């Protein structure tokens, strides 16, 4: 059986594509860089992949606001193809700036109800924190559900998840869209700096209603090996990133293999 093919979407300013590429490869997938210009020129097609990942960075220099230019370019050259990809049930994952991109594209929720905005601290937050899985998402359930807190690095200035009202937040929970929450070593907490940006309800990661479009602010690809972790986590057999990417490739192999 061929390894699952994972497209890594790029444009000028993305800068975490290499870490994502090698994380996918080390976990048994077949990664491929897909520049937005390759899609526009017809050299590569969204439909060729089993999963898509939009990596972190500062796409288009984050001019106007984080992720909006990359989102506009993707919608212009492959809007229908990406919608069809998502409707097929295949995973689309946005990490940090990639999360901002897919939020701008409206792939997780309505933009007038749900947004990523400036950190409460008013500055770029770059540190380690922890996340705890809070949904029953089948892609990551076996590795993360009910197994405590997992160390992850964050690095962003516009990572605060905000909702337009209590009804929107309630609907996210009803639809099981809250994938991970910020935590300390004891469990979910809203306290800074563990919640580095002030996200509502300490939410670190969201999905669409079907669970296959996934956005997260932490960077699992930056903690693939235990030696990249800090404190007691450096002595764990498997780091968070390996668990994350192993889960993705295992899911793809079972469902779309």
Swiss-Prot record:
Function of the protein: Part of the phosphoribosylformylglycinamidine synthase complex involved in the purines biosynthetic pathway. Catalyzes the ATP-dependent conversion of formylglycinamide ribonucleotide (FGAR) and glutamine to yield formylglycinamidine ribonucleotide (FGAM) and glutamate. The FGAM synthase complex is composed of three subunits. PurQ produces an ammonia molecule by converting glutamine to glutamate. PurL transfers the ammonia molecule to FGAR to form FGAM in an ATP-dependent manner.
Domain named Glutamine amidotransferase type-1: residues: 6-237
Keyword Cytoplasm: yes
A GO molecular-function annotation: phosphoribosylformylglycinamidine synthase activity
InterPro entries (UniProt xref): Class_I_gatase-like, PRibForGlyAmidine_synth_PurQ
Record's keyword annotation contains Nucleotide-binding: yes
Native source species: Thermoplasma acidophilum (strain ATCC 25905 / DSM 1728 / JCM 9062 / NBRC 15155 / AMRC-C165)
Keywords, comma-separated and alphabetical: ATP-binding, Cytoplasm, Glutamine amidotransferase, Hydrolase, Ligase, Nucleotide-binding, Purine biosynthesis
GO CC term (a single one): cytoplasm
Cell location: Cytoplasm
Pfam families: GATase_5
Protein name as catalogued: Phosphoribosylformylglycinamidine synthase subunit PurQ
């Amino acid at each position: 059986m061929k390894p699952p093919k994972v497209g890594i979407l790029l444009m000028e300013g993305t800068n975490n594509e290499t870490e994502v590429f090698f994380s996918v490869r080390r976990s048994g997938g077949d990664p491929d860089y897909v520049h937005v210009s390759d899609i526009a020129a017809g050299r590569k097609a969204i439909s060729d992949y089993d999963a898509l990942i939009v990596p972190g960075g500062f796409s288009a220099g984050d001019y106007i606001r984080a992720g909006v230019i990359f989102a506009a370019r993707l919608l212009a050259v492959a809007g229908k193809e990406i919608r069809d990809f998502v409707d097929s049930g295949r995973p689309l994952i946005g990490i940090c700036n990639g999360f901002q991109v897919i939020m701008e594209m409206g792939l997780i929720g309505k933009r007038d109800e749900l947004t990523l905005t400036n950190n409460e601290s008013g500055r770029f937050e770059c540190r380690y924190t922890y996340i705890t899985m809070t949904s029953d998402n089948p892609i990551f359930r076996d590795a993360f559900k009910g197994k405590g807190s997992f160390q992850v690095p964050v690095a962003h200035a516009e990572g605060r998840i905000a909702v337009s009202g209590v009804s929107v937040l309630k609907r996210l929970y009803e639809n099981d869209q809250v994938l991970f929450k910020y935590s300390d070593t004891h469990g979910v907490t809203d306290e800074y700096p563990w919640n580095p940006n002030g996200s509502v309800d300490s939410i670190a990661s969201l999905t669409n209603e079907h669970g296959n479009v996934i956005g997260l602010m932490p960077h699992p690809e930056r903690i693939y090996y235990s030696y990249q972790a800090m404190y007691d986590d450096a002595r764990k057999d498997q780091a968070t990133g390996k668990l994350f990417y192993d889960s993705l490739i295992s899911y793809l192999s079972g469902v779309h293999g």
